[in-house]
Amino acid sequence: MSEFTIVQNKEDLIDAIKSKLSEGYKESEMTVISKTKLHIDALHDSEVNLTATSGSFSDKMAKILTGEDGEEAVLAHYKLPEEELERYKKEILNDNYLVVATKDTTSHVEADKANVAFETNQTKSNSHYSEETNGPKS
């Protein structure tokens, strides 16, 4: 289940993200949805996903030709009831921001165990290498 927070300006946006971090969410579990592309230095090197509903020039042209609604296309990912979808769509069109926090409940342990790129081998006593590996981690 995703938690949606509506904010009206960039300062409140940073505060909302900090609040979600203090609630235990990771940066990678948060998305900021806006009408236009965001340029916020504080989020430049973060893992927070910044999604603009306007898209690129080619996206805009495709929307004109197909009649697709950019806000609805982005919000469809969250499988919201129609009334919530319309409410959040209206907020985006009014130049507000949505901070969406979704807990990642998947387990990544299996991938860590099966990743041969980070598998290490025992060194041979006659070897001049400090460690032999089967991948980029050396």
UniProtKB/Swiss-Prot annotation:
InterPro entries: GSP17M-like_dom. Residues 118-138 have a biased composition (Polar residues). Transmembrane segments: none annotated. It comes from the Bacteria. Residues 115-138 are annotated as: Disordered. It holds the Pfam family YflT. Belongs to the UPF0355 family. This is UPF0355 protein SSP2326.
